[in-house]
C-alpha cells in the first residue's frame, strides 16, 4: 500500500532534523578539541578573547579585602632600614648553640650595646600605635673564608610564639628556616605572609600590651658542630658572620609614647648564678656593680613608698650568647629553658644587695606579663656561678610618656663614661686618688734633708728637674688608680653652678720634667719617673709647697739601703715632721704645752728616730713629689726665685686660702691611705726667651696669614697642635693677649708694664 503524502513530509522533516543534529554535534566536538578545520577559511569577524589584566585583578582583590576589613587600617608611614643585630660566633660544643635571638619589633631591632640610641625605627615606634613588616631580608655576611674553618653550620629560623622551647636541630628545621654554610654569603627573604600580625595583619607597638599582640616574630640563629681551625690544631675563636636586617616597616594609628623609642639593649660578659628562693621560684643573680646590673637597675621601676620586697614591672629578655650556662646548672625541671639559650626576667626590688642583683626567671613573655615565675622542684638546689656573655634587651617601659623620669633616663646614657683625651695645657684639672705617705716612721710622716759629705747643703733624696732648674723634694706620696677630670667649680658662692667638662686619661700626658731619687747610700741619684703636671700653695709671699705629679718609669724600691739612713753619727741626714704651729713642750699638767699661733715650724726629729719606711711603686704608677721651698711665683711647673730651705721656723701673719688642695697632703699621722683631691695644671715651659719669641712670632704669622703657604682660611687646614697651648699658664702668654688687643705700634716693654699694672702678671 502506497504511503500517504502527509507521512512522507513528516519523515523527510525528521530525517533533515537528524542530519542537522549530527552536524551540530560534530561541530561542537570539533570546537572542544580545538582542531583546526581543513580547507575552511578562518572567520575574520569572530572577536578574540581578551587576556585578563593581572594588575587590575590584584587591585580588585585588595579593594575587596579592604572593604571587608581583612587587612585593617591602611599604612600611614613606611620606613626602610638596614640594621645590624649581631655577630655569629664559633660553636664551643657539638650541640646546637644559640647565637642570636631578637624580636622584630621596631623598638627592639638594634645593634648589641646600642643602649637607647634613637634610630629611624625607634622614632617611628615612639609615635605610631600599630606596626607590621611588608618585606624583610636577613643578610649573612661572612667574616671568614670557608677554607679557614670547618665543623660548623648556621641555621636561621623564625619563631612566631614569643617564647623559648626545647628545640633540637631537627625541631629548628621544622620551622621556616635557612641553612648557611660557613664562609658563604646568604640572603633570606621573608614576606608579609610570614610576618603578619594578629590584628588584621598588624601588631601593637606598645610592648606593655599582651606579648602575643605586640613583640612580633622572633628571629633565632643557631650553630651546630664545634668550630675548628683548618690552619692549626685548635678551636676557632673569631666570629663567623655578621647578621643584618634589611626591610620595610609600616606604621598606622598615630599614638605617641616616647619611652618606647628608648628601650635599651646591652651585651656584657659577667658572672651568672641560678638559684631557688624559699618559695621555690627560680632566680638569676649577677654582680651588683657589673654593667649588666646597672643596665637592669631600679631606675626603670616605679618609685614605692614601701621598703618591702616586690617585683619590678620592667621585663628583660636574656640571651645566653656565650653558651656558658649548661642545662645542668639550671634548677629542675627547667633545664630545657636554660639550654634553649634565652628567657625573661624581672628585677626583685627591696632585697639586700650583698649577694648581687637578683631577678625572677620566666619561661615566656606571657608568664612574665602575668607574674608567673618558673617554679622549681629542687628545693635543695646547689648554686653554681658561671661566667658567660649575656645580652639583655628591655622589652617594655612602665612609664611610656615623657614623665619626670625621662630626662634622668636619657642622662644615664653617659655612664659608664670612660676617660679619654687630655687636659689642655695651662688649663686646671682635678686629680683625685687615695694616697699613701711615701716616707714614714711607724705612725709619723717623715721629711728628709740630705747633707751627705761631698754633696751640696740642703739637698733631699728626691728631686724634680724642670728645664735647667732642679728642685729638692723632701718626701713623696703614692697614688692608687688616680682619676683626672675637668670641672668649673666656683671658689666663692655664686649663681654659677659647678659643671663637669672632662674625664681625662693620664697615661698619654707628655713629660714636662724628670724625677730623680737615691735609695742606696753611698751612691748618686738616678731617674725614676717623668713629671707630667704640678700644683702649688703659697703659704707666705716667699714660702710655698709644690706637688709634682710623677709617672714612674723605674720601679721605686720598698726599702732604704745603706747605714747612713739609720746610723746618723755625722748628722748628714736629717728627719723632720710636717708643718705645725710652734710650741713649747711640757713635762707635767701644771706646765701645759704652749703654742705660738703666728709661727709655724718644720720640727726636726731626734737622730735616733730610727730607719724610716718607704712605699714602693711599680712602673706605670703615679706618685706626688712634695717640694718645700722658697719662691715668689709659680708657672707651668717652674718656681720663680727658687731657694732650698735652711730654716725650720717661720712667722705667719695670715694663712692664704688653699684652692689647690696641696695642704691636705700634710697629715699629722700616717693612715694606711687617705683621700686627696688636687687642682693641678700641666704645661711645657720654653727653654729660652729666644725660643719663646720665635714661637710667638711663628704662631702670629700663621694665624694672621703672614706666613708662606697660609692662604687658606679654612679651620680644617690649621694644625691640631696649638703652639700657644704650652704657654697658656705662663706670664708671657698674657703678653700675647695684650699685643692682640693693640691697634697701633707699641714697644714690648710698654706692653709688659701695661699688663703688670692691670694685674695680669704673676
From Swiss-Prot:
Residues carrying the site annotation Cleavage: 305-306, 354-355
Chain segments carrying region Inner core: 67-259
UniProt keyword list: Capsid protein, Clathrin-mediated endocytosis of virus by host, T=3 icosahedral capsid protein, Viral penetration into host cytoplasm, Virion, Virus endocytosis by host, Virus entry into host cell
An annotated GO BP: clathrin-dependent endocytosis of virus by host cell
Keyword NADP: no
Gene3D superfamilies in UniProt: 2.60.120.20
Cysteine pairs bridged by disulfides in the record: none
Biased composition (Basic residues): 41-56
Keyword Disulfide bond belongs to the record: no
GO CC field: T=3 icosahedral viral capsid
Chain positions covered by the region annotation Disordered: 25-56
Family statement drawn from the similarity comment of this UniProt entry: Belongs to the astroviridae capsid polyprotein family.
Protein name: Capsid polyprotein VP86
